[in-house]
């Protein structure tokens, strides 16, 4: 009652960990205390074409490729050092964090702070899917600033440009609510893609990850598909 009177309670939406196999939510406490397994997943570094800049791309890394149709924005750290870089002998220009350029053996053209990327808009290969188009409702994919308290950006892992899907990730959802950007719903309780998502509709996102890679390959937007070894929470009920 006191919390209500102080205006501390509200009705809204949130993201919770969910086991698609047994159809149950998993509490944060269970994730913190129950089993983790070391697993290897195929991640993806996707190329997003920057609007108004010929042959210029954002390099964005994600360990959850199934969420890419839900991409709404890309986050950068305004104060960290980013670069414009390219592969030797090639014309494509990429934006990414400085440390990642060295790891990917790219030639650095120039460096600058992340804030110079803010406001750039880009296209996603999933934009023509009916459900995506409806959810975005004219919103242009944009480079946004991270919130270090919600989503800190690493200089040692990934590309420094973070895929933001407010309908799928907890930190993404928090940042999306703060910035009032759209949410794209992708899957049901059994991890099956909803209707109006083109060839993905009816497919299980967790059992058939290759459908995303095949789609990206046809769109010619894959920069790399690195294997990623990490500790991953598992459902104790399964």
Regions found by a protein language model. Give the residues of each.
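Residue patterns forming the tRNA-binding/recognition surfaces of aminoacyl-tRNA synthetases
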Residues: 1-69, 132, 154-238
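Catalytic alpha/beta core of large soluble enzyme barrels
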Residues: 70-72, 76, 80-188
């Amino acid at each position: 009652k006191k919390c209500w009177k102080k205006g501390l309670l509200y009705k809204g939406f949130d993201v919770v960990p969910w086991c698609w196999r047994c159809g149950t939510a998993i509490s944060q406490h269970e994730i913190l205390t129950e089993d983790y397994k070391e697993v290897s997943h195929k991640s993806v570094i996707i190329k997003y074409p920057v609007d108004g800049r010929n042959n210029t791309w954002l390099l964005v890394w994600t360990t959850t490729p199934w969420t890419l149709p839900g991409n709404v924005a890309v986050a950068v750290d305004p104060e960290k050092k980013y670069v414009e870089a390219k592969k030797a002998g090639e014309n494509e220009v990429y934006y990414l964090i400085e440390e990642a350029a060295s790891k990917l053996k790219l030639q650095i053209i120039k460096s600058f702070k992340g804030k110079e990327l803010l406001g750039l808009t880009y296209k996603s290969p999933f934009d023509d899917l009916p459900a995506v188009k409806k959810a975005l409702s004219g919103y242009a994919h944009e480079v946004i600033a991270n919130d270090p308290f919600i989503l800190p950006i690493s200089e040692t892992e990934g590309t420094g440009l973070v895929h933001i899907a407010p309908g799928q990730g907890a930190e993404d959802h928090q940042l999306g609510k703060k910035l009032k950007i759209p949410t794209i719903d992708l899957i049901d309780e059994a991890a099956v893609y909803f209707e109006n998502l083109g060839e993905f509709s009816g497919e299980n996102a967790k059992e058939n990850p290759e459908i995303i890679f095949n789609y990206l390959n046809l769109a010619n937007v894959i920069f790399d598909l690195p294997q990623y070894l990490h500790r991953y929470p598992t459902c104790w009920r399964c």
